Curated annotation (Swiss-Prot):
It comes from Homo sapiens. This is Uncharacterized protein C9orf163. It comes from the Eukaryota. Residues 174-203 are annotated as: Disordered.
Amino acid sequence: MPGPLTCTPAWQGQGRAAAFLCCSFQRAGAVVGVPARWHRGRLSSQQRLRSSLGGSHPCPQLGRRLVREGVISVPRQQGRRRCRESFSPADVAPGPICSANICLSGVRFLTCLNRVREHVVGPSPSPAAPICFFPVVEALCTLRGRRCHCLPFPKRGMQRWMLPLRRGARLLPLASSKNPRARSPGLDPLGSSETLWSHRGGH
């Protein structure tokens, strides 16, 4: 079984790594508090028909492309429960990743998974905390060999997309939570050809 931060051949390629990672987090059993209603409201009409969501669904079934530019608002988390999120390749738009990781943005992760994140991304903003909030896209940074500089939440309930480092640049420490606007030199502008994640327009 693949590890939580590996990408099998079936899932490799732009637009699919995030979908595979969702399933990985499910296997890790470390996902809690998925805001299903928020996700359902962001499904396209076609996706709603395909997924046959009705009323309050226990967990979102499909992601959607990022429409808003750069920032995704996330509601407060609900009660603890294991996430049953899953995707198929057809649910993830081709091209740069722009939808699948929205399903877990702002979700709380337990310490056991946070240790994996620390190994992959860097020090946690609050390593002593039993539960730490952080964007899922931070954990996605090493998929397909990319190393990215990750920004913490600028404030509670908001998700800021990260920017990949230029080739050959070393992984820099996370910006301080007291100074979320801090940026490191050598970052590609959002929307450039080197950007792995959602760029302007979500295409």
